[in-house]
Amino acid sequence: YEISACLVGSEMCIRDSGHNDIMQFIRPGYGASFGADGRKKAWWDALEDPGFNQMKYLKNLMLTFPFFERVPDQSVIAGTNGERYDRAIATRGNDYLLVYNYSGRPMQIDLSKISGAKKNAWWYSAKDGKLEYIGEFDSKVTSFQHDSGYLSGNDQVLIVVDSAKDYVQKAWTALPDAIQKWNK
């Protein structure tokens, strides 16, 4: 499954765009493009595949942080950004930033773009919603690369938050269901 990033207005989004059987509503016996023919799986059976459930991770990520102050901001990425699959996509609020990295390529992130002298950072898996605290950092340009390697399903979202804020707890291994969080 390919998870790709895009900007929608001032919103970063991650979407499942690689399951041909679902995208094309493949049915057995009907031809389709991109090599999908329905012999392996009909679109209704593909709804049970892992990629179909990934949108809940996007929902939890987006609703964890203040919505109306969020803006796209590629200046968060210091130095040279990659192209195509190596291009990182950034959005931020006043005290947090999110950087989607499809390929796992090393990136330089300017942590001074948000408030606070110290920042807490996590990796968030777009594939399974796992959250991994990676430490506290000074407010400066800092190198990040997830240890899962380069390409082949290693897309991650870097989450960085002003250490004075508590949007995300260091001990969390997943983001809570956002709807339940806001209904408390």
Language-model-detected regions and their locations in the chain:
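Aromatic- and carboxylate-lined catalytic core of secreted/periplasmic carbohydrate-active enzymes
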Residues: 10-11, 15-135, 147-183
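Short strand-edge motifs at loop-to-beta-strand transitions and within beta-strands
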Residues: 142-144
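Juxtamembrane C-terminal module of membrane proteins
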Residues: 137-140
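Positively charged, low-complexity/disordered segments
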Residues: 1-9
